[in-house]
Design a protein with these regions (language model features):
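Active-site metal-binding motif and surrounding structural segment of the metallo-beta-lactamase
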Residues: 33-80
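Structured catalytic core of nucleotide-sugar glycosyltransferases
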Residues: 5-15, 56-64, 77, 88, ...
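A generic "binding-loop/recognition-motif" signal
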Residues: 12, 32, 59, 83, ...
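A generic structural signal for short beta-strands and their flanking turns/coil linkers
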Residues: 14, 23, 49-51, 73, ...
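Conserved beta-strand hairpin/beta-sheet module of binuclear metal-dependent hydrolase folds
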Residues: 1-43, 128-144
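Metallo-beta-lactamase
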Residues: 81-136
């Protein structure tokens, strides 16, 4: 099983969930921490069950609730260095141990998911999308 759910999408905020039987990851946290919690609870996902947050780029509609949410639930954040540096207010709220630097085109794993970031054109410092693989299934996420 590899499932995708759009929690929020649009200029007022973006946040997506990708899940398997064993793994729950959030992609972007562009609304308040409270709104993310409410959206997850509405689909029977306990926010504390998340295994990480992937960040596509630093625009507010993709990171507004990131720092508060990641801090509250002690979640790992997967982000490239340029994007991290471009969001200092969010960065200061995230525990250093939870910052996982990623690179475009370099695969990494979160539990049973293999993830490969890819470059996307956008007016941000180093925006990326994600190809997410589980067994013979694939989901590709490209925002904006």
């Amino acid at each position: 099983m590899l499932e995708f759910c759009s929690l929020y999408s649009g200029s007022s905020g973006n946040s997506l969930l990708v899940k398997t039987e064993n793994t729950n990851i959030l992609i972007d946290a562009g609304v308040s921490s409270k709104k993310i919690e409410t959206a997850l609870n509405s689909i029977d996902i306990d926010p504390s069950s998340l295994d990480g947050i992937l960040i596509t780029h630093e625009h507010t509609d993709h990171v507004q609730g990131l720092g508060t949410f990641a801090k509250k639930y002690d979640l790992p954040v997967f982000v490239n260095q340029k994007t991290l540096d471009a969001m200092p207010k969010q960065k200061e709220k995230i525990s250093e141990k939870n910052i996982n630097l990623i690179k475009i085109e370099e695969k990494f794993e979160i539990k049973d998911l293999k993830i490969k970031p890819f470059a996307i054109p956008h007016d941000a410092v180093n925006p990326c999308g994600f190809n997410i693989f589980k067994d013979n299934r694939k989901i590709s996420i490209a925002t904006d």
